[in-house]
Design a protein with these regions (language model features):
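Conserved beta-alpha junction segments in alpha/beta enzyme cores
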Residues: 2-88, 95-235, 253-260, 273, ...
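Structured soluble/peripheral alpha/beta segments that form catalytic or ligand/cofactor-binding pockets
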Residues: 241-246
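Anionic-ligand-binding alpha/beta catalytic cores of soluble enzymes and soluble regulatory domains
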Residues: 265, 272
Length: 437
């Protein structure tokens, strides 16, 4: 029997007050104006048996305690496990202080967090009455809007590109260019209902020196959503990928840079939409099932954190190890992998390469905030990101392995194999042509 996907969604403004501390660059910058609104956007998918909820926030990050509390509460409202509720942040650097920074825990905007929690629960309560049928399409394309901010010399020494503008022409580090999209279509009217875009870049395009860093703004993810909605009528979500070392090509250049980058990504998403919907046999997923799963793993802290635990937020102090969570949710043959902190693109790409799903998208700052998560060799080459990598270098590969294991476990639970495990038994032709099964 054909399985009919149902979806419901919300969009809620989450601006702080003018004067609120602006997160991301310093602990002294206070906002002076709102340039464009911050939002949280949520999507509920129901396959008739299981549900998943994905919420994206125009925020820098959220603490683990907050994520766990409100994922659990949302799950109770919807009658689903907390592992089927995923939070992710765009990593916006033009919003309020929403995490407990080491030594600056007192600067957490607690009244804002209380209000945010109420808004999450209010919007989740409304979702079940909004469900409507939807066809689900997927599509990915490469879009050249980001670059790797690490310049690494032939003898493997890294420099932080934003501090050395003259090195930009030399920048050739790995960059994840994938713009991954999901399109939810009205099956009768054949019009788009909801669009998700996934791309890896710090939202820093609009953060110009001076006044540009004191404006409340969603940066390019907001411009992306606005353009999509204005042109299609569909609501829209942006999910940041593994953006730890990814920056916009026009980073820190102001409002126009943010707006134009968002529009260029949105145009690429519309091109993807056209291609996907005009080739339904290839890109429309059939009998879509959804699922969620989380996996925990424990790793030893680096000596710098063991010797001086004031480098850690209060709630991580007192232990030689740190326990982290990897979370996966799937919509058909597309998986979102929710990672803690700021994973670098190289790690995100490894997870994508090893996943058993047709397409895998990374969800940034999803399960906790633990600063940067880097490949082990970054601690050899240096640069900005490894300075705040929390755990032992040799465990970066275990981070990848835990995420990949989670993708396999989730796919097997949603689409159980018969006999030999998927995808081991697949025997593809040497050259695949559209229309082949």
């Amino acid at each position: 029997m054909q399985r009919i996907m149902k979806i419901a969604f919300f969009r809620r403004e989450i601006n702080p007050e003018i004067g609120a501390l602006v997160a991301g660059y310093s602990m002294t910058d206070h906002s002076v104006m709102i340039e464009d609104d911050l939002f949280m956007t949520g999507l509920l998918c129901d396959d008739g048996e299981n549900k998943i909820l994905l919420i994206s926030f125009d925020l820098q990050a959220l603490d683990e305690w907050f994520i766990k509390q409100y994922r659990s509460s949302c799950g109770e409202i919807l009658g689903i496990p907390a592992s089927s509720v995923m939070f992710t942040c765009t990593h916006n650097h033009s919003g309020p202080q929403t995490i407990c920074e080491p030594r600056y825990e007192h600067l957490l905007h607690r009244s804002y967090m209380d209000d945010l929690g109420k808004k999450i629960l209010e919007e989740t309560e409304k979702l079940t009455g909004k469900l409507q049928d939807a066809d689900c399409f997927f599509y990915s394309s490469n879009v050249d809007e980001n670059l790797n901010r690490r310049y690494v010399t032939p003898d493997n020494h890294a420099s932080f590109l934003p501090s050395y503008n003259e090195m930009r022409p030399l920048c050739d580090g790995f960059a994840d260019k994938e713009l991954g999209c999901l399109f939810f279509m009205d099956p009768v009217k054949k019009l788009p209902l909801y669009i998700i875009g996934n791309y890896a870049a710090h939202p820093l395009a609009g953060h110009a020196p001076g006044l540009g860093g004191l404006k409340i703004s969603a940066d390019f993810p907001g411009a992306f959503r606005n353009y999509i909605t204005a042109q299609t009528g569909a609501e829209c979500m942006f999910v940041s990928g593994a953006a730890g070392d990814m920056i916009p090509k026009e980073d820190e250049l102001g409002s126009d840079a943010a707006r134009q980058m968002g529009i260029r990504l949105a145009k690429a998403a519309l091109r993807s939409h056209i291609a996907a919907t005009r080739n339904k046999d290839r890109y429309c997923m059939q009998n879509v099932k959804v699922g969620g799963l989380s996996k925990k793993f424990t790793v030893p802290l680096r000596k710098k954190y063991l010797d001086d635990q004031s480098n850690l937020p209060d709630f991580y102090q007192g232990s030689p190890d740190i326990t982290l969570e990897i979370q996966c949710i799937s919509i058909g043959d597309v998986c979102f992998v929710g990672l803690p902190g700021e994973p670098c693109a190289e790690l995100g790409q490894e997870i994508k390469w090893h996943s058993p799903f047709r397409r895998t998208f990374i969800a940034f700052a999803s399960t906790a905030y633990i600063d940067y998560v880097v490949p082990g060799n970054f601690l050899v080459s240096g640069g900005y990101e490894p300075r705040s990598h929390h755990f032992s270098a040799r465990n970066s590969i275990n981070f990848v392995k835990a995420a990949v294991d989670a993708t396999y476990d989730l796919r097997e639970s949603v689409y159980p194999s018969e006999g030999e495990p998927y995808p081991d038994y697949i025997d593809h032709p040497l050259v695949w042509k559209p229309g082949q099964q």
